Amino acid sequence: MELAERFLLDALAYLECALGVVCYVLLKLVGSPYGRYASSGSAFGLPARAAWTVQELPSLALPLLACAGAGAPAERLNRWPNCILLAMFLVHYAQRSLVFPFLIRGGKPMPLYAFLLAFIFCTYNGYLQSRYLSQYAVYADDWLSDPRFLTGSALWLIGMLINIHSDHVLRNLRKPGETGYKIPRGGLFEYISAANYFGEVVEWCGYALASWSIQGWAFAVFTFCVLFTRAQQHHKWYHEKFEDYPKFRKIMIPFLV
């Protein structure tokens, strides 16, 4: 049974990588029709705050259930590396499901299909990461001092802080009573159009490096594929919307792309 589930977790990780590539191609073709790109006549729109909270919850609930030993004792969570890595995952999704939605100002309705896809992914990936770390991931006794873990943990923290700060910048572009869109200023937005996405990609690449597993890297690959296409869409939109948009700004990676 354990061998079969371990094989399943590896297969799901490789599938997540493949799905990331598929999503990249599809989103390049059709774009991401939610948020500012959603049609005003879209049917079955869900309130933004409620949609964000519910769609992200599986990635918070499943690790918590793993910690509680629901279904099977969390055999590997008696090891510090496993606990810290799972905590990284938990902290991110606690912020995304319990804090971020309630900071949203206004927010266009979320199309039902976008909500369902996000909910399915958070369930899929939440199971993959939490089950692997709680039951199967084995690390050396000195893993906490390994350069991969230290570097990855630092990148995770830096990426999360960039993501949170960039979201704060975006929320405060408009003063009370103002409507419409503005050019983001400050922080990494001085260099790239999608600083919030860059932060999240750095965060999960750091997590992947610290976990040193196909499960962790699958999440990082999927995140990059989805967010980079969204960043390209933003970058193009900004240039079309604002004649004075800074020409030197890159899409998502400072000074490069």
Swiss-Prot record:
InterPro entries hit by this protein: 3-oxo-5-alpha-steroid_4-DH, 3-oxo-5_a-steroid_4-DH_C, SRD5A/TECR
Subcellular location: Microsome membrane; Endoplasmic reticulum membrane
UniProt key word Transmembrane helix: yes
Membrane topology summary: Multi-pass membrane protein
Annotated EC: 1.3.1.22
UniProt keywords, alphabetically: Differentiation, Endoplasmic reticulum, Lipid metabolism, Membrane, Microsome, NADP, Oxidoreductase, Sexual differentiation, Transmembrane, Transmembrane helix
Catalytic activity: a 3-oxo-5alpha-steroid + NADP(+) = a 3-oxo-Delta(4)-steroid + NADPH + H(+); 5alpha-pregnane-3,20-dione + NADP(+) = progesterone + NADPH + H(+); 17beta-hydroxy-5alpha-androstan-3-one + NADP(+) = testosterone + NADPH + H(+); androst-4-ene-3,17-dione + NADPH + H(+) = 5alpha-androstan-3,17-dione + NADP(+)
GO cellular component, one term: endoplasmic reticulum membrane
GO biological process per UniProt: androgen biosynthetic process; cell differentiation; sex differentiation; steroid biosynthetic process
MF GO annotations: 3-oxo-5-alpha-steroid 4-dehydrogenase (NADP+) activity; 3-oxo-5-alpha-steroid 4-dehydrogenase activity
Class of enzymatic activity (EC top level): oxidoreductase
Origin superkingdom: Eukaryota
Transmembrane portions of the chain: 7-27, 50-70, 84-104, 109-129, 149-169, 208-228
Major localisation: membrane
Pfam families: Steroid_dh (PF02544)
PANTHER family: 3-OXO-5-ALPHA-STEROID 4-DEHYDROGENASE (PTHR10556), 3-OXO-5-ALPHA-STEROID 4-DEHYDROGENASE 1 (PTHR10556:SF57)
Stated family: Belongs to the steroid 5-alpha reductase family.
Function summary: Converts testosterone into 5-alpha-dihydrotestosterone and progesterone or corticosterone into their corresponding 5-alpha-3-oxosteroids. It plays a central role in sexual differentiation and androgen physiology.
UniProt protein name: 3-oxo-5-alpha-steroid 4-dehydrogenase 1
Originating organism: Bos taurus (Bovine)
Gene: SRD5A1
